[in-house]
Swiss-Prot record:
InterPro entries: Aldolase_TIM (IPR013785), TIM_sf (IPR035990), TrioseP_Isoase_bac/euk (IPR022896), Triosephosphate_isomerase (IPR000652), Triosephosphate_isomerase_AS (IPR020861)
Location(s) in or outside the cell: Cytoplasm
Active-site residues, Swiss-Prot/TrEMBL: H96 (electrophile), E168 (proton acceptor)
Family assignment from sequence similarity: Belongs to the triosephosphate isomerase family.
Record pathway: Carbohydrate biosynthesis; gluconeogenesis; Carbohydrate degradation; glycolysis; D-glyceraldehyde 3-phosphate from glycerone phosphate: step 1/1
Signal sequence interval, chain numbering: none
Protein known as: Triosephosphate isomerase
EC number(s) reported in the record: 5.3.1.1
Major location category of this protein: cytoplasm
């Protein structure tokens, strides 16, 4: 792994004030520094102020799990990119498979959210990936190509440089299933090559992380693959020791 490693924890809809305080404090204590790697936690909206309070001035960044594609307006229940920056966020996840599947977010909407994030100087963590049915139909590359092309078509390839791409095989999310390191590497290489068709320098530099049931006991093997630069971590990010171990595995 020649690029700097990156690990982001996605807490999803878990946590409370007491648990968060303990978890964040443990992560800060466990990660005083990283060599050629960085890490972040993406927390539920109500806990952004808490994350900011605990993490400010540490080696751990923080961010959100979703944003509206709109900057402001009569959009009840929505949260804008600018609101996240008010809480010091550096990152935001866009296009997570759960957003696409449960809330009907299509490629165009995800592209608009990506653009909205960058307009407010947030780094989007763009999720791409295929379902089990799509994989079994040998449609993995076509699906991911459409997801990437929607973003590049809207913002241009230069904007991709200021982002992180997360490959999440939907069939491996929360199931305990994990793509083999080689299966994950093959898709990561495809993503990098797809970007390289537009700009090889950007493709060489961009961080592409893996988001399919990464745990402390498989992180090192996954991150050793040449095109896997870290992970987007779900359940394991809620356990301090697991998350810390994964972050250290991303060092190079």
């Amino acid at each position: 792994m020649t690029r700097a490693g990156f690990v982001a924890g996605n807490w999803k809809m878990y946590g409370n004030l007491v648990q968060n305080q303990e978890l964040l404090a443990a992560i800060v204590l466990g990660i005083p520094s990283l060599q050629n790697a960085s890490c972040a936690v993406c927390v539920p909206y109500p806990y952004l102020a808490q994350a900011q309070s605990v993490l400010k001035g540490t080696h751990v960044a923080w961010g959100g799990q979703n944003i509206s594609q709109h900057h402001q307006g009569a959009y009840t229940g929505e949260v804008s990119a600018g609101m996240l920056t008010d809480f010091g966020c550096r990152y935001v996840i866009v296009g997570h498979s759960e957003r696409r599947t449960l809330y009907g977010e299509d490629n165009q909407m995800v592209a608009e959210k990506f653009h909205s994030a960058q307009e407010q100087s947030l780094v989007p963590i763009l999720c791409v990936g295929e379902t089990l049915a799509q994989r079994e139909a040998n449609e993995t590359e076509q699906v991911i190509a459409r997801q990437l092309d929607a973003v590049i078509g809207l913002v241009g390839v230069n904007a991709i440089k200021q982002s992180v791409i997360a490959y999440e095989p939907v069939w491996a999310i929360g199931t305990g299933e994990t793509a083999t390191p080689q299966q994950a590497q093959d898709v990561h290489a495809f993503v990098r090559n797809r970007i390289a068709a537009h700009n090889s320098e950007i493709a060489a530099d961009i961080q592409i992380v893996y988001g399919g049931s990464v745990k402390a006991n498989n992180a090192s093997e996954l991150f050793a693959m040449p095109d896997i630069d870290g992970g987007l971590i779900g359940g394991a990010s809620l356990v301090a020791a697991e998350f810390i171990s994964i972050c250290f595995a991303a060092q190079s």
